């Protein structure tokens, strides 16, 4: 779901933080960490393609979640106590 003037979609991605993510974890887009195992990602990939590309980099039994978000200030998630710079990243600052 996008309304940011581009072909990218904003996603919320979470994986079990106890899973060993690779040192060079490719998030396939512009991304910002929110917390251990949680990222906001803007990607031109479809949800299915992004989900599988992220899943294949993690151990087989890792719990994961990928959800599209409406990429407009009115649709951004509300949050507190997340990684520094997350709101600035959303705003493009």
Model regions and ranges:
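Short beta-strand/turn micro-motifs at beta-sheet edges
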Residues: 1-2, 28
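Short amphipathic alpha-helix segments
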Residues: 10-27
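Short, intrinsically disordered low-complexity segments
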Residues: 27-78
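Charged phosphate-binding loop/patch that engages nucleotide di/tri-phosphates or the phosphate backbone
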Residues: 79-93
């Amino acid at each position: 779901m996008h309304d940011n003037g581009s072909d990218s979609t904003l996603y919320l991605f979470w994986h079990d933080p106890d899973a060993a993510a690779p040192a060079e974890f490719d998030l396939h887009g512009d991304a910002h960490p929110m917390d251990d195992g949680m990222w906001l990602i803007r990607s031109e990939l479809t949800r299915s393609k992004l989900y599988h590309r992220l899943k294949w980099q993690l151990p087989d039994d890792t719990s994961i979640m990928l959800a599209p978000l409406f990429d407009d200030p009115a649709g951004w998630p509300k949050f507190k106590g997340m990684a520094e710079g997350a709101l600035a990243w959303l705003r493009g600052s």
